[in-house]
Amino acid sequence: MWARVLLLGVLLSLLADLHAASGGDAGGQKTWNPRISDCELPPEKGPCNNLELRWFYNLKSKRCERFFYGGCYGNANNFKEINECDRRCVSPDINKPG
């Protein structure tokens, strides 16, 4: 019985540490946001050789810009339509200073 209680306490402690490390309850600091992280990635053509016109969010210009995607792999900063890129990445949350 005590072993189960001890194990439960250890598991809850590990979960709390994991939650804090992932940005949850950061004491007023910005928390981790996967949408913003995706938009901060550089454009990634990937290893394939197709020439697919795609859009990526350029963190420096704060705009969605065109690039050629190879057709495989790449990353999440890769949108088929500029409207999708704008909707996901061009927002007040990203453009606000630190």
UniProtKB/Swiss-Prot annotation:
Annotated localization: Secreted
Segments traversing the membrane: none
Disulphide bond pairs: 39-89, 48-72, 64-85
Keyword Disulfide bond recorded: yes
Pfam families: Kunitz_BPTI
Limits of the BPTI/Kunitz inhibitor domain: 39-89
Keyword terms of this UniProt record: Disulfide bond, Protease inhibitor, Secreted, Serine protease inhibitor, Signal
GO molecular function ontology, one term from the record: serine-type endopeptidase inhibitor activity
Source organism superkingdom: Eukaryota
Stretch forming the signal peptide: 1-23
Tissue/organ expression: Expressed by the venom gland.
Coiled-coil blocks: none
GO cellular component: extracellular space
Site label Reactive bond for chymotrypsin, positions: 49-50
InterPro entries named in the record: Kunitz_BPTI (IPR002223), Kunitz_BPTI_sf (IPR036880), Prtase_inh_Kunz-CS (IPR020901), TFPI/VKTCI-like (IPR050098)
Record function comment: Serine protease inhibitor.
Family: Belongs to the venom Kunitz-type family.
Record protein name field: Kunitz-type serine protease inhibitor kunitoxin-Phi1
Organism: Philodryas olfersii (Green snake)
